[in-house]
């Protein structure tokens, strides 16, 4: 489409349908700043998820996702100006243009350092199958969300966050909702929709 540079690229979490295209993007597009809930160690190598590691299938799947994410960072790191790991303990506010601002919202703050410790251990070769399975199941729980403000309108991008993680004061009314997690029942509850009161909703069904 003629795009050769992105000022900011935000990754919400590490499931294949959210980071699987990162390599293809970085092949042809430079990125000023990559925002992510986890940045692999600079010297990290391939995880070899399908090697003879004795891990159960669910744990291997987590390693595949992390390899799919970390691989392009190794190959195309020179195409990224800066990688910023978001701490997860406070809302991040960005002014994207004079008219457009964005809040990045997180799940439970305690999730992110725990998740970081498990992923760091995996890249060091310390692979605890139980921990990997647990955090594989928790990827959606720790998914980032965004709220954009443009000329008096508010647009909420729900990522894959589960509804119970933000049926709180952060779920205030909006104009447009990008429905979380393909409108799954665990992420799009009646309570959440009552809180958000969107005038329009967009659903992704072909991830």
Residue ranges of model-derived segments:
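A local structural micro-motif
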Residues: 6, 81-84, 201
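N-terminal catalytic scaffold of extracellular/periplasmic and nuclease hydrolases
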Residues: 1-8, 36-37
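Flexible, acidic/histidine-containing loops and adjacent segments that form or flank the divalent-metal
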Residues: 19-20, 24-155
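Active-site-proximal loop/helix segments of hydrolase catalytic cores
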Residues: 1, 10-27, 111-207
């Amino acid at each position: 489409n003629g795009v050769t540079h992105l000022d900011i690229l935000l990754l919400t979490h590490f499931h294949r349908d959210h980071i699987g295209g990162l390599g293809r993007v970085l092949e042809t597009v430079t990125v000023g700043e990559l925002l992510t809930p986890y940045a692999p160690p600079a010297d990290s190598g391939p995880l070899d998820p399908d090697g003879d590691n004795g891990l159960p299938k669910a744990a291997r799947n987590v390693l595949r996702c992390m390899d799919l994410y970390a691989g392009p960072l190794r190959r195309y790191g020179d195409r990224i100006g800066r990688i910023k790991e978001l701490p997860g303990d406070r809302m991040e506010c960005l002014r994207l243009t004079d008219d457009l601002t964005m809040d990045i919202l997180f799940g439970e703050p305690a999730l992110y350092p725990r998740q970081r410790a498990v992923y760091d251990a995996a890249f060091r070769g310390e692979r605890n199958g139980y921990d990997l399975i647990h955090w594989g199941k928790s990827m959606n729980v720790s998914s980032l969300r965004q709220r954009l403000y443009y000329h008096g309108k508010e647009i909420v991008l729900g990522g894959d966050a589960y509804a119970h993680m933000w049926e709180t004061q952060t779920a205030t009314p909006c104009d447009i909702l990008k429905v979380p997690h393909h409108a799954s029942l665990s992420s799009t509850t009646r309570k959440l929709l009552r809180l958000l009161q969107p005038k329009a909703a967009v659903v992704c069904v072909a991830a």
